[in-house]
């Protein structure tokens, strides 16, 4: 964590991106058959990184898996497969086909005058 602290002191914020499922053991469950691909090494890095970023009050942008990291890092739990474990009349599927990994998976609307909007303006030189 001390290395993470020194790294986080040098950055303005942290982006937690999408990716594989978190290991269910992180939120007190055994792996079920419906659980997707797991990235334990990434979990081991991102959970303490999220906790330290929050502790240091660093801005965090979480996308897809990033929201799951935030939730679990703060003590929350997850469905291993929400479509199979939570019955709903609405189809819930948050995955992207490997063959389509170059196209956006999610539409993003950035609200004007938010920190993300300011960052996007600096990064992309547009409003």
Where are these regions (language model features)?
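Flexible gly/pro-rich beta->alpha loop and the following alpha-helix that scaffold active-site loops
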Residues: 1-61, 74-75, 79, 83-88
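Pocket-forming structural segment of enzyme catalytic cores
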Residues: 74-127
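Conserved G/P- and acidic residue-centered "switch" motifs that form tight phosphate/ATP-binding loops
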Residues: 64
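Hydrophobic, aromatic-enriched interface-forming segments
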Residues: 67-72
